[in-house]
Amino acid sequence: MNIKRTIITMFTIVTTILQAAGTLSPVNSGLKPAEIVSHDVVVTINNGFAQTEVSQQFKNINDTTMEAIYSFPVPQSASLADCQVQIGEQTMNGEVVAKDKAKQVYEEEKNAGNNAGVADKNGYQDFSFKIANLAPQDTATITFTYYQPLPVDTGVCRYQYPLEEGNTDDAGAMGFWERNDKPTGKATVRVILRSAWPVTAVRAPQGTVASEQADLANGTADITYELTEGLTKDFVFYYSLANNLPGRLEVVPFKRNGEDGTFMMVLTPGIDLKPITNGADYVFVLDKSGSMCGGKIQTLAKGVAKTIQKMNANDRFRIITFNHNAEDITGGYIPATSENIQKAVAMLDGVTANGSTNLYDGLKTALMKLDDDRVTSLVIVTDGVTNTGEVNPKAFAKMMSRNDIRVFGFLMGNSCNWPLMRTICDVSGGFYDAVSNDDDIIGKIMLAKSKITSEAMHDVKVSINGVKTYDVTKDCVKKLYRGQQLVMFGRYKDHGDATVTMKTRISGDDKTYTCKMTFPEQDEDNPELERMFAIAQIEMHEDMVNQGLEDQAENTDFVRGIGLKYQIVTDETSLIMLTDEQHAKHNIERNNQKRVQAERTAQAQRKTQPVKNYRVDAPRPTSPMPANSPAPQHSNGMFQYHAPHISHGGGAMDVWTVVIIAAMGAVAARYRKE
């Protein structure tokens, strides 16, 4: 029987001439960028999502009035929800309006000599903030908040505060701006962790611990880190959940009485996905374009070499390099013998970086010469922004849909083309994740292999009956992999008992799993869910446009409408920061003010209460389960086993775990040194 299981692992690396988040001024303006007096971040991780609040002080060190500009990379799936500017005794609060209206109001106030602020989203690349008419020696404090879902992968949760610029802008844009990324005072990140499940360890490679309080057995920690290198490096925080936690279904609701509700549903399968033991093929597709210079191509080559050296005797591999075109440097598949590995490492040492990036040609070449009788994994290392050859997302979607493949997409660096990667993965039933330049490349490759070497759940479909739900995202996915959570957002009418059903195929066998739960009539603990639901909707419709399933003009109207309704910054909406009097003058409704008040009230209440467990597939414990508690037994097979964890599993996972743990420290240290 032919086995057509082709897997692509794509590592998208953005590495050249790395810049940092910071203040900007035009190079030829004669003005220096605003001085960063302090930069303080508070991250609250609670029940599957993170709230990030950034407070930064700017000072105009010029002798004339200036427009202060600050930019930072767009975090993955982030909903920028609030921004406040304080200049002396004057406070300006943000309201989301259509982008053209925000620009008009901002320019009007700026030209009148008044203070005003505006926050914009520039595609997938960055958020930018402008403050008009900052007087000489004046200090402004800007505070903004964003929310994002934070899924767990194989028992490990990862949070990233992006600071490094990804260098995806053109050279002219980079040369236009002078940048300041060094605070004169301290830069700190405070992480408040509130997990409903026991935690065994936390780690932040880039931060120096300034203060720490932790009760990991009960899932809580409060740690402040100092960023000693300023705003030049991403801040990455990891925490590991306890081993032997159960597979589970968690549903976090939000519903005002008399209105439709919103929910975030997180499925952590406890299904026993067995290891694949047959010999496999691996194709490494390495970007050697000019953006991979500065020692990065050599670092990645070493990572690939380490991966090859851990292969089984019956595995084969193939190496392709590409810039404006592709070259098969191994001349096809070769067995993973010691001699062949040594030859391949020597070839990789000779690769130099130059030229442009043709991602489409790299993928096209990678899909050639596939053996239907063997599991094939394609590991693609690229700088993320294709600038030569085919660049239309529809063409990528069409090519991927013609092949029965799996794409594992890992985007390293910030300002990466998340929409294109989502399209490639959604069409092919793949998996994608972020890798910071201050993260671990080798560890990510190893973690991907734990998914590649295990069975997957195919054609996953989730349905909810008993309560009317609508606008549900991710309820149908082609594949779900070992250790991967399925995170869905949706809306519901009324309230009451419901049955959640998941249908899937595992090794050709049809499986059906069910779970009963209750949607509440009223639950106002998590109003932030509405903003994250809106971002999930935008991403879903963006993918439909990229696949040719929705018209771009129709999508533009949709994005503008949902951005205004839920008060989030999008490509079609902006935050305009004005005083109360200015808002009234421009007839701007205070919709965001109401949302922010509700969110802050809920956040204050949550701080005084024990961490709430939202598990619905079993009686909810009143406190986090001890780390050594066995998984509860259910008649429902989805929850018969423990959830996969990085520290246990079948097949070759134990070997790969050792490599991951060793690599996480070594690679992070090397990046910092470079």
Regions found by a protein language model. Name each.
Residues 4-6, 18-47:
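N-terminal, polar/Ser/Thr-rich
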Residues 82-88, 93-118, 130-134, 139-285, ...:
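An acidic, Ser/Thr-enriched
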Residues 170, 269, 277-334, 340-375, 411-417, ...:
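Von Willebrand factor
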Residues 320-347, 364, 368, 387-394, ...:
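Short beta-strand-loop
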Residues 382-428, 433, 440-446, 503-505, ...:
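VWA/integrin I-like adhesion module and closely mimicked acidic/polar interface patches used
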Residues 418, 423-468, 475, 482:
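C-terminal helix of von Willebrand factor
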Residues 654-673:
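A cross-kingdom C-terminal cell-surface attachment/processing module
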